[in-house]
Amino acid sequence: MSERRVLKAPFTDDVVRSLKAGDMVYISGTIYTARDAAHKRLVEMLADGQPMPFDFDGQAVYYAGPCPAKPGKPIGSVGPTTGGRMDAYSPTLIAEGLKVMIGKGSRSKDVVDTLKQYTGVYFAAIGGAAALMAKCVKSAEVIAFDDLGTEAIRRLEVEELPVIVVLDCQGNNAYERGRREFEV
C-alpha cells in the first residue's frame, strides 16, 4: 500500500498540477466552508467592489454547512454539499484565485473549463461520512455572514481530511472515467 499523500493548504499551482483525477489525498491546513447563499453573496460583493472576507489566492472552499458542535468539539458533522449548486458562482471565484473546491457530485462544463484555465481542482469528499469528516476538523470559526446560520463562512483548520480528485486541471474527470471503465 502506498504512503498517504498529505497536501498542505493553501495550494500552489505546482501542487494542483501534480494532481490527477482519481487520486486520493488528504488535506491539512486552513480551508473555508461556503455554500450557495454565501457564494451568491461573495459574487455580489465582488461585483460591487467590496472587500472579501478572506483572500482567495490558493485557497480551498469546502461546500458544507456543518451541524452544531457538541460540547468540547470544534464542529458538528460536516458532510459535503452537491457542487453543482455552486456552478453559477464558481467560475468567478476561481478567476479571483480560488484553487480548490471540495464537494460531491458532478460539475458543469463551464466550471471544468475554468479549472483548466486557472489551474484549479475539484475534490469529492466522502458523502455519508459527515461524522468522520468532523474528526479531521481541529478548529472552526465563523468569519463572515453569521446571519446565514449553517451557511456562514467558516475558517477550518483540518488535519488529513480525506478527498478524491474528481476534476484535475487538465480537465480529466474521475466520474466519467469510472462510468466508462465499469459499463457493462
What spans do the regions from the language model cover?
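Short, structured beta-strand/loop micro-motifs enriched in basic residues and often containing a Trp
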Residues: 2-11
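Active-site/ligand-binding-proximal alpha/beta "capping" segment
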Residues: 90, 166-184
